[in-house]
Design a protein with these regions (language model features):
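Extracellular/periplasm-exposed beta-strand and loop segments of Gram-negative cell-envelope proteins
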Residues: 36-51, 79-109, 139-175, 209
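Membrane-embedded beta-strand positions of outer-membrane beta-barrel proteins
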Residues: 28-30, 72-74, 114, 130-132, ...
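Outer-membrane beta-barrel strand-turn architecture
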Residues: 62-66, 120-122, 188-190, 224
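Residues that define the transmembrane beta-barrel architecture of outer-membrane proteins
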Residues: 24, 50-54, 106-112, 126, ...
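Transmembrane beta-strands of outer-membrane beta-barrel pores
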Residues: 32-36, 76-80, 108-111, 120, ...
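Outer-membrane beta-barrel "beta-signal"
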Residues: 25, 186-187, 212-224
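Short glycine/proline- and aromatic-enriched beta-strand/turn motifs that initiate or cap beta-hairpins
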Residues: 20-57
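Repeated loop/turn-to-beta-strand initiation elements of outer-membrane beta-barrel proteins
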Residues: 24, 67-70, 126, 190-196
Length: 224
């Protein structure tokens, strides 16, 4: 995080940001997201699935000059994923067996993005803003998470806590996550927006299986 703060300070210094002198824009958005996990131990993980969730948030923009914009805000989202795992032990026949038929996660989180965008004015009432940067996210609650064991027992579980069932164990998912974000905003009539972005976590949010988060988001909004 120190590196992120340092890079942010460098960007602000480089563009000569003067909050009092620059035009401030703000707005709100609501949309849908598709999320899951990538990476991980290929010997233990299989059948990764995408989860559908939502995102609502407020947006703040500072016009830096030369069409560059510093974009931030605060988002509230529901995201998660689904996967299956193989047992770390070898069966009597010498083959691997399933340990968890399904591991389902779903969390509610607050997120702060920090991005730099460039506004292309295509016409009098239309502009496109490609943007890229980083995000920080913190999970405040685990909801509707559960585990289906190899013997078809479904057990409720808070994925931000450890799961233990006799000799079966799943480490807790980390509450804090951060990573890269890139996307594009389309502004219509100076106020209405249609946005899409992709987020990829840099932190191993589940150390036991070495997984990182990802999500794709589509939203509509209004810019004041």
């Amino acid at each position: 995080m120190k590196k992120i703060c340092f890079l942010t300070l460098m960007l602000i210094t480089a563009f000569g940001l003067n909050v009092n002198a620059q035009k401030l824009t703000y707005g709100a958005h609501v949309g849908v997201n598709f999320s899951g996990y990538q990476g991980g131990d290929g010997y233990h993980l299989y059948d990764e699935k995408v989860r559908t969730g939502y995102e609502i948030g407020g947006n703040i923009g500072y016009k830096l000059g030369y069409n560059f914009i510093l974009l931030t805000g605060l988002n509230f989202s529901q995201s998660g994923g689904r996967f299956s795992t193989m047992s770390p032990y070898i069966s009597e026949t010498g083959s691997q067996t399933t340990e968890f038929k399904e591991v389902n996660t779903k969390v509610l989180s607050f997120e702060i993005p920090l991005k730099i965008g460039y506004e292309f004015n295509i016409g009098h009432n239309f502009s496109i803003i490609p943007n890229a940067g980083m995000f920080a996210r913190y999970a405040i609650a685990s909801i509707k998470s559960n585990v289906i064991t190899a013997d078809d027992r479904t057990q409720k579980w808070k994925c931000t806590d450890d799961f233990n069932d006799e000799s079966h164990h799943i480490d807790a998912f980390k509450k804090f996550d951060y990573g890269f974000v890139g996307g594009v905003d389309m502004i219509f009539s100076g106020h209405y927006s249609l946005s899409a972005d992709y987020k990829h976590g840099l932190k191993k949010i589940q150390p036991q299986f070495g997984m990182k988060s990802w999500s794709a988001n589509i939203s509509v909004g209004y810019r004041f």
